[in-house]
Regions:
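Hydrophobic/small/kink-forming positions within alpha-helical transmembrane segments
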Residues: 21, 47-52, 56, 78-83, ...
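Transmembrane alpha-helical segments that form core, pore/gating elements
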Residues: 5-6, 17-20, 81-83, 119-177, ...
Length: 232
């Protein structure tokens, strides 16, 4: 039941699109919603940053680095979002907000490093670079997509983002996806796949999309610091 990174990406992106599409077409109020042509460029960019690049860089990076290195690099996410939001959306960087994010970063790093000794092995450099691109891509996504999330329905946004994201990851993942032997999957493997698609992808993206409609990008990113607490 072992799956390669690109196989997981193929299944989770396609599965999430199917769920979002199914919900939208089954509800009349959502079925009639459209995205304005002027928003197409931002939609495409958001899809590439938040789905395609984010997913491929993260899983590829984990194959070449340690979870500790990945967690440390990801802890920079709220800081990058704060910078991008100030630059692109002209959000004000207040002293209290900056201080809170830096304090959260320090706390997250303490939890990560206390539970796992830091290893600065040269062999992790390639993987670390992938994770850096992943973190920068996700941070930029939270800022670039914000105007769309405020304007449109979350389910409709997810439908289109994951459709575009699937088109983008398809050339890189289809070869491995065709090699998946579904007949070898036991019940635990099927449960794991469904959990990845529904729990850690569809629900996670839905709540983030919903939150961006009501909160600033930097506040949404700030909740990244809850992850080390939950893991610990």
């Amino acid at each position: 039941g072992h799956l390669l990174p690109m196989q997981i990406i193929f299944l989770r992106v396609l599965g999430t699109f199917v769920i979002a599409w199914g919900i939208q077409v089954s509800i009349k109020e959502l079925r009639i919603l459209k995205i304005e042509r002027a928003d197409y460029p931002r939609l495409i960019l958001s899809s590439l940053l938040g789905v395609a690049i984010n997913q491929m860089m993260f899983f590829t990076g984990l194959n070449h680095t340690t979870p500790v290195d990945a967690a440390i690099i990801n802890s920079v996410n709220p800081i990058l979002v704060l910078v991008f939001a100030a630059w692109i959306l002209k959000e004000r960087i207040g002293i209290s907000r900056l201080g809170g994010i830096l304090l959260g970063a320090a706390g997250a790093l303490m939890l990560i490093l206390l539970g796992n000794p830091l290893s600065l092995e040269g062999g992790n450099l390639t993987g670390d670079m992938y994770i850096i691109v992943n973190t920068a891509s996700w941070s930029l996504y939270l800022v670039v997509s914000k105007p769309l999330m405020v304007k449109y329905n979350p389910i409709m946004m997810m439908r289109w983002m994951f459709l575009i994201g699937f088109i983008a990851v398809f050339p890189f993942s289809v070869e491995q996806a065709l090699e998946i032997d579904f007949s070898s999957f036991d019940s635990f493997t099927w449960f794991s796949i469904l959990y990845i698609i529904i729990g850690t992808t569809f629900m996670a993206y839905f709540f983030i999309t919903y939150s961006l409609k009501r909160l600033s990008s930097s506040v949404v990113a700030y909740y990244t610091y809850i992850q080390p607490v939950l893991v610990a």
